[in-house]
């Protein structure tokens, strides 16, 4: 059975299992779950088994191995991989294989991890349900009629279904934390700049950040240790020393920590009682473990969502302008170009983009282009940047008073597939509690925090000051030692490992 990443690594080190056995189990679980979950856009069976055989041979020969040697991992299909397609779950990039690995992928491989495949996502990471994918909808392993969240829905579902113990997602406005909450796993969005964005196909460059997803805080700490660090190829990478995150896992309590509870937005319509209950439970657990619990406010939190949905589409409009049919990706047939009323170059651009992008991507490009246009730049984009500064100031002020902030991840547990697809505003409000961390650039972690009346997972969120991932990991690990929410598995996981 595929357990947590930390358990598998111990078994590999002790010789209890071989890398070939672990990878074979992972691939078998993918095959079993793919028809109902559809977590993967590409499965690398042959190369994964070859890599596993190489790890076992090196171990037998007594060679020095990387800290993740033999561990199966899955990569969100927005991160470049030189040996398999990177499609961003879009027709625009269908079949595209990059000539290089993203830095985070290269670092995981260098640490010995074995990439078993690429995971499904909302197209170009734009969505909160993995329903905008051109590769089909992904189901939630707890209930396949529900969404796994988005945009890293496939990465979260792959862990929850037992296909891999560790996956790599990206978070622009909550895209690691929301799927982690919906799928009952742990997901970490690092500080902006802590992890390289080189090789990450950009959605919103000032917001995007890659991070690990696994069952426990211990697992995501292992992943973060391998992928974090300065990268000169990324101009936004922070040249700061990466601490050893292991001591954070040894903490037995949170004595001396002051944790501020965020309640903004909890009184709105549509907030599930299970979300409030999970937050109350987390408060109680942290108080019992020695933390001082206080109230904290972020005065401009009501502007998080509107600010995000100006800045992110503006950056997307710019970033996605490179996909034009000329150099790579989808290109409309020459016959259609010749039949168009406009000139051939304009026809190639417009028809290729119209055919290659899905409706949600087109919507955000249009919104961003409008907000950046000459008559509206100051009223929308420039104004949003000013509000973003106020939001960052709110965080700075709050962290003068507290060590961490505790709050919800999502307004509700996982909602039904197709429930919000025709209502973009309802879908955007799924980001109500998560986009603040992206706008401020601070690290945040989603922890399994409970279950609703029908057994769907509910998450809780911790946020920390810039570059204080160690603080997050310490508190999160203490919470998980004092609770068992992260140890529960969905029916799909049990079915995949019943043999």
UniProtKB/Swiss-Prot annotation:
Sorted UniProt keywords: ATP-binding, Ligase, Nucleotide-binding, Protein biosynthesis
EC number: 6.3.5.7
Known catalytic reactions: L-glutamyl-tRNA(Gln) + L-glutamine + ATP + H2O = L-glutaminyl-tRNA(Gln) + L-glutamate + ADP + phosphate + H(+)
InterPro entries, per database record: Amidase, Amidase_CS, Amidase_dom, AS_sf, GatA
Transmembrane segments: none
Gene Ontology annotations for the cellular component aspect, listed alphabetically: glutamyl-tRNA(Gln) amidotransferase complex
Superkingdom classification of source: Bacteria
Enzyme class, UniProt record, top EC level: ligase
Signal peptide bounds: none
Disulfide bonds: none
Listed PROSITE patterns: AMIDASES
GO terms for MF: ATP binding; glutaminyl-tRNA synthase (glutamine-hydrolyzing) activity
UniProt-annotated catalytic positions: 76 (charge relay system), 151 (charge relay system), 175 (acyl-ester intermediate)
Coiled coil region boundaries: none
Record GO biological process: translation
NCBIfam families: gatA
Biological function: Allows the formation of correctly charged Gln-tRNA(Gln) through the transamidation of misacylated Glu-tRNA(Gln) in organisms which lack glutaminyl-tRNA synthetase. The reaction takes place in the presence of glutamine and ATP through an activated gamma-phospho-Glu-tRNA(Gln).
Subunit relationships: Heterotrimer of A, B and C subunits.
Family: Belongs to the amidase family. GatA subfamily.
Protein name in UniProt: Glutamyl-tRNA(Gln) amidotransferase subunit A
Native species: Rhodopirellula baltica (strain DSM 10527 / NCIMB 13988 / SH1)
Name of the gene this protein is made from: gatA
